[in-house]
């Protein structure tokens, strides 16, 4: 079984990567599905890796037995971008995400590829996680990343 972790700075393209990976056969990519605040209760990085492994195992079971996984989503789909095109009065874009079950209606083998992305949390733990998981960091031009942060209501850099 292949469990892949995606990391990178926020707004670097990790959500787009998940959306694209979900178009591949025998692959499911989840957008920030875990409660990363649970990581703080772990005694060390190895315990966090155990928590992630358990999450992956439970998610695989759920996908095979029930056809769904828990993930952030927009109207039941993992989007390519969580920032809305519309802007608010302040000129910043909003996000419309929910956290809950996402149906996966494609055939999955017993050894399908499961991808989990948590940019900030996995970046902080990359040294430990890369010893147990296949990890990929998404890199985007820093100016484009900062411009994206500046356009969002939930990333108030202007203050």
Label each PLM-derived region with a short phrase:
Residues 1-4:
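Extreme N-terminal starter segment of soluble prokaryotic enzymes
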Residues 14, 99-104, 121-124:
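A generic local structural motif
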Residues 6-21:
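Glycine-rich phosphate-binding P-loop
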Residues 23, 35, 144:
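Active-site micro-motifs of SAM-dependent methyltransferase domains
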Residues 23-31:
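Post-Walker A helix-loop "phosphate-sensing" segment adjacent to the P-loop in P-loop NTPases
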Residues 113-159:
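PAPS-dependent sulfotransferase catalytic domain
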Residues 10, 31-33, 139-140:
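Glycine-rich, histidine-containing beta strand-loop boundary motifs that form or position
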Residues 30-115:
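PAPS-dependent sulfation machinery
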């Amino acid at each position: 079984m292949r469990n892949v972790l995606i990391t990178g700075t926020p707004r670097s393209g990790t959500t787009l990567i998940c959306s694209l990976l979900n178009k591949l056969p025998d692959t499911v990519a989840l957008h920030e599905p875990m409660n990363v605040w649970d990581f703080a209760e772990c005694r060390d990085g190895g315990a966090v890796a155990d928590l992630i492994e358990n999450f992956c195992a439970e998610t695989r079971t759920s996908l095979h037995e029930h056809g769904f996984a828990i993930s952030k989503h927009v109207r039941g789909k993992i989007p390519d971008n969580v920032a809305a095109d519309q802007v608010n009065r302040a000129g910043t874009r909003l996000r419309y995400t929910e956290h809950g079950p996402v149906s996966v209606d494609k055939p999955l083998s017993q050894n399908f590829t499961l991808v989990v992305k948590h940019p900030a949390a996995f970046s902080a733990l990359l040294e430990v996680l890369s010893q147990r998981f296949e990890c990929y960091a998404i890199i985007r031009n820093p100016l484009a990343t900062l411009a994206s942060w500046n356009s969002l209501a939930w990333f108030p850099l202007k203050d």
